[in-house]
């Protein structure tokens, strides 16, 4: 199995210009596979403004820039892909909008069936969770780490673990077989700061 990698999710609300240096410092502190811009229920103008500010600094570091929920905006704003939930744009429509070469990831909660369907349809990754309590959003489901192990044994499509992940809880998910750890509060609210959090997560994921 390849090393687990960090998948950063932006805070629920922020000023793009003020947040940019913090994000840059976090990306420079260790390996990060991708950054997901998640501004739930924000107007299109706010989302596009955040993309305009953050996408260049993310992509300049060879890190993928993913937009949450909005394949239409992702396609027109130069994002590397989109992440869709079960109540968002269906996978096939998202793929049509962003194109064959873009990344499309799908939330599958704790459902093996949803994950199998997403994988068979062509999703670039599936996301399971929430594994731990989270203050970022109200989780619809609680997932058992065993689902990561099962997925690794069954499928080649990468899996992302999400939900309340901290430096302290990460080892369990790494050992269970997560390819990526999707982290929000565990980085941005880390006592020593986001850059220290990224460095700590990298140490944990390298064993």
UniProtKB/Swiss-Prot annotation:
Q: Which domain of life is it from?
A: Bacteria
The similarity annotation says:
Belongs to the thiamine-phosphate synthase family.
Its recorded name reads: Thiamine-phosphate synthase
What are the BP-aspect GO terms? thiamine biosynthetic process; thiamine diphosphate biosynthetic process
Q: In which pathway does it act?
A: Cofactor biosynthesis; thiamine diphosphate biosynthesis; thiamine phosphate from 4-amino-2-methyl-5-diphosphomethylpyrimidine and 4-methyl-5-(2-phosphoethyl)-thiazole: step 1/1
Binding locations of 2-[(2R,5Z)-2-carboxy-4-methylthiazol-5(2H)-ylidene]ethyl phosphate: 134-136, 164
The record's EC number reads: 2.5.1.3
Task: Give the encoding gene's name.
Answer: thiE
Q: Which reaction does it catalyse?
A: 2-[(2R,5Z)-2-carboxy-4-methylthiazol-5(2H)-ylidene]ethyl phosphate + 4-amino-2-methyl-5-(diphosphooxymethyl)pyrimidine + 2 H(+) = thiamine phosphate + CO2 + diphosphate; 2-(2-carboxy-4-methylthiazol-5-yl)ethyl phosphate + 4-amino-2-methyl-5-(diphosphooxymethyl)pyrimidine + 2 H(+) = thiamine phosphate + CO2 + diphosphate; 4-methyl-5-(2-phosphooxyethyl)-thiazole + 4-amino-2-methyl-5-(diphosphooxymethyl)pyrimidine + H(+) = thiamine phosphate + diphosphate
Name the UniProt key words of this record, in alphabetical order.
Answer: Magnesium, Metal-binding, Thiamine biosynthesis, Transferase
Please tell me where 4-amino-2-methyl-5-(diphosphooxymethyl)pyrimidine binds in this chain.
Answer: 36-40, 68, 107, 137
Q: Which cofactor does it need?
A: Mg(2+)
Q: What's any one GO cellular component for it?
A: cytoplasm
- From what organism does this protein derive? Rhodospirillum centenum (strain ATCC 51521 / SW)
